[in-house]
Amino acid sequence: MKLLGGLLLLFTATCLCNVDCDIYKKYPVVAIPCPIENIPVCGSDYITYGNKCKLCTEILRSNGKIQFLHEGHC
């Protein structure tokens, strides 16, 4: 039972540590239409982005050098 709980926790943590930016790849980086919503996320450059779309813009602009760290402010 502990093994199952540990695997579930690992799976959940893995899923939360990724942002799917594939939907934004069809736009030029300078023209990605991000919604006006304030749901902050922290990037691996330790900058707080206003939402996942704005982080994806930077991820694509940096060719993947910046990554998602966690939800909320850095």
Swiss-Prot record:
Example of a GO biological process term: negative regulation of cytokine production involved in inflammatory response
Keywords: Disulfide bond, Protease inhibitor, Secreted, Serine protease inhibitor, Signal
Cited Gene3D superfamilies: 3.30.60.30
Domain Kazal-like per the UniProt entry, residue ranges: 18-74
N-terminal signal peptide: 1-17
A GO term for molecular function: serine-type endopeptidase inhibitor activity
UniProt site (Reactive bond): 36-37
Subcellular location: Secreted
Disulfide bonds: 21-56, 34-53, 42-74
Gene Ontology cellular component annotations, sorted alphabetically: extracellular space
Record-linked InterPro entries: Kazal-type_SerProtInhib, Kazal_dom, Kazal_dom_sf
A Pfam cross-reference name: Kazal_1
Functional note: Probable serine protease inhibitor.
Protein name from the UniProt record: Serine protease inhibitor Kazal-type 7
Protein's organism: Rattus norvegicus (Rat)
Lineage: Eukaryota, Metazoa, Chordata, Craniata, Vertebrata
